[in-house]
Structure formats: C-alpha cells, structure tokens
Amino acid sequence: LKVVIGRDARISGPMIHNLVVNTLVGLGIDVIDLGLSTTPTVEIAVPMEKADGGIILTASHNPKQWNALKLLNAKGEFLSGADGAKILEIAEAEAFDFADVDSLGEVTENHAYMDIHIDEVLELPLVDADLVKTKKFKVVVDGVNSSGGIIIPNLLEQMGVEVVKLYCEPNGHFPHNPEPLKEHLGDICKLVVEEKADFGIVVDPDVDRLAFISNDGEMFGEEYTLVAVADYVLSKNPGNTVSNMSSSRALRDITEKH
C-alpha cells in the first residue's frame, strides 16, 4: 500500500505529521511525503503517484489550535460517508496489526508537487496565461501565514502578475480568523485600496477555500465567485452544473443562459 501525505503550516503540523507518517510506516505502508502542501495539491498527487489514498493534515479554516486529518481515496477524492465510517470502526476496534521489522513501510520525500500543481493549472485549456500577462495586474494575496502564501504568489507571478504579499510566511501563526469571511478580512481590504491593486485573493490554511476582494476594498462574495467562474467555463464549454443547497439561484440562471 502507498499513501500520499501533505500538511498545512499549522504549528502542530510537524508533530502530527511525525505521528501519522510513523504509524503508517509501522503498518507496512509506504509514504510519499509532500511536506508543506495544499489540499488540492494532495488531491492531484494521489492519482499521479498511483497511490491507494491520501491524507492532508489540516483543520481547514478552523483556528490555529485545531488540527485534523482529511482522508482521500485512490482517485484523490474525499472518502464517502460509508468509507469514513469503516475507518472509524477499524480504529475504534484497533483491528489492525503492525508490520514486522522486515516489512516496514518506506518514506519518500517529494516537495515538488506545488510546482507540479502550478504547471498543471497553467496547462489547462481555459487558462490563458499569455492574455493575463498583457493585463499587468497587481494583486494582493493574504495567505494567512500558511501554504497558500507559497503556491498562490508563485502561480500569479508565473502569469506576470505583480504580487503584494500579506501574511504569506508559512509559520502557522494565523494573523486573523482563517475562515475567509468579510468580518475577518479588514487588513487585505484596506491594503487593496492603499496599493491601488486590481483585486485581492484570500485563502484558508489548506487552500481549498478562497475569497476575492474587489479593487474598492469590498469583498466579492463566494457565491458570486462560483457564478463568475461558471459563466466563463460554460461560455467555452456549454454543459450542466452540479451544486449543493448553499449555492445561490444565480448559478442556475447562468447555467440556463448557456
């Protein structure tokens, strides 16, 4: 068996990382260790590595004292409720055996996956990096002092964007509540206006949520972000959309428009 592991920059991350990796090794499972990473990066790494699953060590947008495990299947997708229940059942019953010393798992470090992820994004047919370069955008990025402070500026800079970094040191000391809600984003809203930036980007610690700030310092809500992206994608590739109950009616309207 082989499992891909990545973590956000939480202060407890190295401790939890050592615990999880060494437990897997003790069970005879090989580990591909991505080090500091993002949830979407681990998701793409699992099938690329032909791994049996993945684990992201993160508590997502929860405050810094939290930490947890996000579990992925061999497709790099989150486990179903049924599979999650099986994992808990095995753990609670302690229905597992550690490997003998000749059958321990091996750890392989691969810290290239954030760069690989960026390359994959830039190669998407719907991403026109050359067009973005002609616009000479200036963008403020709030990485909440986690791994988003690495990957988001690097992606933007490869598209010719001038990046103003705010809280982009991956030290795990979150300068504000990491959930990207309006009431937590006063600093970036102010900086976007001060820097005369075109817009701002805020991500949560494991970079599976983001919010945009307009050039006037006002938040461009998550529901509008989804609709704007869907409008662009459907204009190039007409089709259907699937959403959850928290999505606005606007997504349905945009889908029907195309």
Where do the model's predicted regions map?
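Short glycine-rich phosphate-binding loop at a beta-alpha junction
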Residues: L1-D8, K138-V140, G239-M245
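N-terminal small/polar loop signature for handling phosphorylated ligands or for N-terminal nucleophile
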Residues: K2-W66, N154-I213
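Gly/Ser/Thr-enriched, mixed-charge loops and adjacent short helices
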Residues: N67-E195
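Proline/glycine-rich low-complexity loops and linkers
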Residues: T41, A85-D119, E123, S214-H258
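Fold-independent oxyanion-binding glycine-rich loops
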Residues: R7-D8, L36, L57-S60, L69, ...
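Short, surface-exposed alpha-helical segments at coil->helix boundaries
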Residues: G13-N18, G84, G149-P153, R252
